[in-house]
Amino acid sequence: MATPSFGNSSPQLTFTHVANFMNDAAADVSAVDAKQLAQIRQFLKANKTNLIESLNTIRQNVTSSGDHNKLRSTIANLLQINVDNDPFFAQSEDLSHAVEFFMSERSSRLHIVYSLLVNPDIDLETYSFIDNDRFNVVGKLISIISSVIQNYDIITASSLAHDYNNDQDMFTIVSLVQLKKFSDLKFILQILQILNLMILNTKVPVDIVNQWFLQYQNQFVEFCRNINSTDKSIDTSSLQLYKFQNFQDLSYLSETLISRISSLFTITTILILGLNTSIAQFDIQSPLYMDTETFDTVNSALENDVATNIVNEDPIFHPMIHYSWSFILYYRRALQSSESFDDSDITKFALFAESHDVLQKLNTLSEILSFDPVYTTVITVFLEFSLNFIPITASTSRVFAKIISKAPEQFIENFLTNDTFEKKLSIIKAKLPLLNESLIPLINLALIDTEFANFELKDICSFAVTKSSLNDLDYDLIADTITNSSSSSDIIVPDLIELKSDLLVAPPLENENSNCLLSIPKSTKGKILTIKQQQQQQQQQNGQQPPTTSNLIIFLYKFNGWSLVGRILQNLLHSYMEKGTQLDDLQHELMISIIKLVTNVVDPKTSIEKSSEILSYLSNSLDTSASTINGASIIQVIFEIFEISLQRKDYTSIVQCCEFMTMLTPNYLHLVSSYLNKSDLLDKYGKTGLSNMILGSVELSTGDYTFTIQLLKLTKVFIRESLSLKNIHISKRSKIDIINKLILHAIHIFESYYNWKYNNFLQKFEIAFHLTLIFYDVLHDVFTINPHQKDQLIISSSANKLLQLFLTPMDSIDLAPNTLTNILISPLNTTTKILGDKILGNLYSKVMNNSFKLCTLLIAIRGSNRDLKPSNLEKLLFINSSKLVDVYTLPSYVHFKVQIIELLSYLVEAPWNDDYPFLLSFLGEAKSMAFLKEVLSDLSSPVQDWNLLRSLYIFFTTLLESKQDGLSILFLTGQFASNKKINDESSIDKKSSILTVLQKNSLLLDSTPEEVSCKLLETITYVLNTWTNSKIFIKDPKFVNSLLAKLKDSKKLFQKKENLTRDETVSLIKKYKLISRIVEIFALCIYNSTDSNSEILNFLNQEDLFELVHHFFQIDGFNKTFHDELNLKFKEKWPSLELQSFQKIPLSRINENENFGYDIPLLDIVLKADRSWNEPSKSQTNFKEEITDASLNLQYVNYEISTAKAWGALITTFVKRSTVPLNDGFVDLVEHFLKLNIDFGSDKQMFTQIYLERIELSFYILYSFKLSGKLLKEEKIIELMNKIFTIFKSGEIDFIKNIGKSLKNNFYRPLLRSVLVLLELVSSGDRFIELISDQLLEFFELVFSKGVYLILSEILCQINKCSTRGLSTDHTTQIVNLEDNTQDLLLLLSLFKKITNVNPSKNFNVILASSLNEVGTLKVILNLYSSAHLIRINDEPILGQITLTFISELCSIEPIAAKLINSGLYSVLLESPLSVAIQQGDIKPEFSPRLHNIWSNGLLSIVLLLLSQFGIKVLPETCLFVSYFGKQIKSTIYNWGDNKLAVSSSLIKETNQLVLLQKMLNLLNYQELFIQPKNSDDQQEAVELVIGLDSEHDKKRLSAALSKFLTHPKYLNSRIIPTTLEEQQQLEDESSRLEFVKGISRDIKALQDSLFKDV
């Protein structure tokens, strides 16, 4: 977090920001950005003296006299803030925020010191500064603790609030006082943590020892005693003023903080006394023991504590201190014979500690401080040292086990290999299987480490038996001889016995009616020990009479301890079945300990081979005949105990058995699954499960939820293991049923847990942590993989149930969405505010992270599924968005900023159909502006959080894409849309506008990670695309030039593209992404800019552009062979799986990068037990590595394609925008694009877009050449056309297969258009045709002949299908793809025209005709015209016109026309239904425009064309045509005499055609065809064929009719009608109507003149 500095435009670096940075850097300093680390180190160097000095809270004259704000002054006095020296506090509008920031800064200083002590590498210089002044710092810290304690209770909220009448001010005071109190407690806790690190394993000076003990006695202990009262820490005097607080949570938090402070006081004291963890003893060479005065001071303090201690009152010092002092005194006396202390002086401290239950308090101390392993280590070392002084008994061993098992591995090993421990352990083992003396202590110690347990229990060499009398023992005394390993002589061991016969003994805890006895065979040696004296002494001290003599016989007998333990547990089961919770405490504890031991055995950390072996031992001695357990394994015994404990509500046993089952699940899922199917733990047959009963009747009443937490752990593990392939043999139905029940139980918990009563407040977080993690994992595994495979997952039904739970309709009231929302805004609660800096561990942070992840995933799933409507969860998030922004601005929770921004991004990205919610409305203007200011501060921070920056850029981009116009305008301009004209560039407030920061940050790309730079540039792209005032980027030469420089350097990307390492691939991916964004920006710059001389345009028009660009379009990163082989190998290895099933799908554009490739974590779960996956040998395929590489390869190719598409958009924009002809380099680009399509094709779906991109780019460039008039050499044109011809024949186009149904038309249409353009660019047709005739003819046959044939055949086929269904010609026939077919036909017709326009040779035309005839194209055209009446669009026979247009164009080539005539052209033109309709006559353009068009522009044009080509050869057919259409001809000519005639250009054209037809017929002497042979005397009669035009009289009559229009212009004006849309527009516009009428008049005059002219 960076806080704005008043009077300074740039934010200042804060301790809070540095502390958070160091927290992230602590994991791996080497991975931190070097520049940022240097800035942090510079800050620390400048402020190192202030880290400690500025923490002292005792200051004089803290408030300024000039501050007239009463509330601000009160708070400043409360916090000891000098307002004059703190401008942020003085000028902050939000006092609560300022106070939180002040406390955060104070806490962060300590956090920085702590981080440096833990990880000095962060800043060695500052660490050395602190280390060199270590003990001065320690002294100052102790003084600060004293100061805080001294001032803790001076001010109460009620006394301060009393002076205020304003409720809001009272509320602020009360809240801040409470926050300060807890902040002070945390402050002390932090200091103690630092103190312990600084004095650990050091020789503490005596002045520090004296200072500590003085303050400890006078202040620290009294403070802890007093503050332990809730009203002291919570200030109950003001409870009425803030009823909103959760008093229970605050009470627990208070107790937790105080108990930790008190415990840390103890640890600090132990360390000051010299406990050294490196040597596992107290260092008596410390100054404390060298200085007599100081030593006596400490001794006197402890003696005084012993002497003045009153019954029922806690001592000043923890019993551990007294215990330690007794050890120290004994140790000193042993080393220094002159020591003056006698036994009584030493033992009184030990006795005092033991009287205060020191061991149990040690256990409590360990539990309280378990959040940090350092303290567990200290206590473990203390226990190791104490082995010299205390025995290992049933009770002490229990404490040892609980504490030491939590210590770091090295210290566990040190303890277990300690010489003293080994000696005591050998004595314990010798007494086995005696219960109290040996068995219980050994089992407890075995809980420390499983390896240790197995080593000690697997082979036991002694068996102890107690007997009051030896009379029944048949033995002989012997002296045994053993060999001395250190010498050649033997050693005689006296007083041994040897059994003369077998001895039968009962195993421990065997039932009275059991007949099971253990036989110790004869000849077994042993030793008899008397225990009379020991017992006498003990019992005489208790005032009892001495007992009879008792004997302990230890036999040298080998047996397996595990078997004995298993037998004992079975015996305990029998007792438990009888007595239940009335079972003896000792036996109950033993039962729990054994179950814990078996739990450790089955823990996944233990190898399955080892655990199976031990489980076998444990089951060896079970009584199968008497057991009620099927199979009588130790696991079944524990299951039976679990079932009984559930029935009897024995909570301790329930928890331990559930933990056992959790640990058992990973390796023995089949056993757990079998048990859960039979058990009543979960709901069954409509009956509520015992888990719910325990929750309701036990946990909710006690406030302890350990079992529920353990059951959630079991749920998580069971789901994970059920997905594993190793458990595929277990019934899928069974696993699904169990998982569904576990999830339903988890749902039930989630809906209500938030409001439960808790004894341990952290359990609330733990429950939330497990629930959110379970829900997230289930939903993620199902909805982020291949959607066709998700239903196969056994968790699919549970995932759907979770969706129903969370994504409920908006009008519903459901608990789950409310609970999840409450978690997200929980940092605003007083309790969780106090947890701000993770002082109580990072569990809360984990809960929040899980909850944000779950929430964003749910919204992403909803947004990606069109069937899911906006949910109640989203509605709640919008309603609570203001609170989310409040959390965003909290100083203590800066680590949640990324998650909040990501959530808001998903929220605004999700689609809404109706009632779109506007974020600005929910935030309000004040909160929106505060949000903007915080965001601006984050964007301008001196040391950036790159993840936050990346998330902010994504949020801006998403905001601009969404409909959140109000917030978008605020962020872009710094002002609200209602305030000013947002389209006015002057309305932008540069100080508050995101644009300003984006512009500044865009110049820092070199120092920004590529991933963040890409998101920044993506945001700028959207700004350019959506915001009219975004020209600041275009006008900024620095911005443009910096991007251009990166673009020019992109050539280096391709210096190595083969055999890339993983790191090189990742690096190249990042660079591709960056180049892609730059290119996108340039495309928008060109589009939006009016500057024709811009740097970008000049750059793109450079001669060597080809060298820079051509590589980007070559997508060669995809390793097809590798992917194919990987899929095959995966299938061979795991036949039941498909690798494609694990391919992830992006649910949102936001997480597109994360969800690309294969789901490795899910594969880890599924294949976790397979060594071929986890630990392949060198000879095996490393599938995990190869799949990781495959995912990376897919990502790499994806960005190759994205970059190529970006370049395509830029070149397209440039080509359209360029005002000058393109240079020759673009021709090379076209050739390159076509070659790439030939070489690489698009065999994968992912390559289709780039394949099309190259085709379309080729067309745009060629079209630009055409528009600019640029000439291309014929050789280059031919070269390009040959490449296009090759592409047409490729499998990607598959023209013959697709053209009929117009499939993949986006592939072939740009190619056809490119050919059209190239044909237009041909300058010399004859030479061109000569050079390319063969290829062109082949192309023509493929594309035109076959293309037209296939399209028309498909149309005819559909017509025939419709006809068979009985549709009459009056019905509209629906033809699939007719519009696309029509477009393709017209495009092909254009191609034919272009080919004929280059004047091909006669021979070329003959071959064309032959091709059309042989393919059947001509025939199908004629057939379609015959059926054209059946296809009507808007009741118009559209296909009739198209087919006649084709015939007309084809007839322009004489050889083709001849083929058409031979194919029956005239008969088709005469007899087709459309022609017959026209033959009825009176077809006028105003009433039947389509039919008239077919007649005039189709039939008449074709007949005239044929007549002009073939003359007398087609005269009979032409005369027949005229006779057939005589009525139409007559009506057209005679209608000119009609006063109501509507004059149109179409009518004039038709009349012109008829006049021309009559003249041509006359010229060919058509009358001769009608001369009939008659007598010589008979006169021949003239035949009238073209009625109305054949005679001079008719012509004069028509001329007269035309003259009427010419001589009466107003009349003509009134009779003119339009026949096209263009004509209609001309007539409607007065300015153009007159000219149009004049044109018609001229046309009529020309028609009149033509009547009497020769052809």
Curated annotation (Swiss-Prot):
Note in the entry: Present with 11700 molecules/cell in log phase SD medium.
Entry protein name: Nucleoporin NUP188
Record organism: Saccharomyces cerevisiae (strain ATCC 204508 / S288c)
Assembly notes: Component of the nuclear pore complex (NPC). NPC constitutes the exclusive means of nucleocytoplasmic transport. NPCs allow the passive diffusion of ions and small molecules and the active, nuclear transport receptor-mediated bidirectional transport of macromolecules such as proteins, RNAs, ribonucleoparticles (RNPs), and ribosomal subunits across the nuclear envelope. Due to its 8-fold rotational symmetry, all subunits are present with 8 copies or multiples thereof. Interacts with POM152 and NIC96.
Function: Functions as a component of the nuclear pore complex (NPC). NPC components, collectively referred to as nucleoporins (NUPs), can play the role of both NPC structural components and of docking or interaction partners for transiently associated nuclear transport factors. NUP188 probably plays an important role in NPC assembly and organization.
Main location as per UniProt: nucleus
Record-listed Phosphoserine modification sites: S340
Residue ranges that the Swiss-Prot or TrEMBL entry lists as coiled coil: 35-62
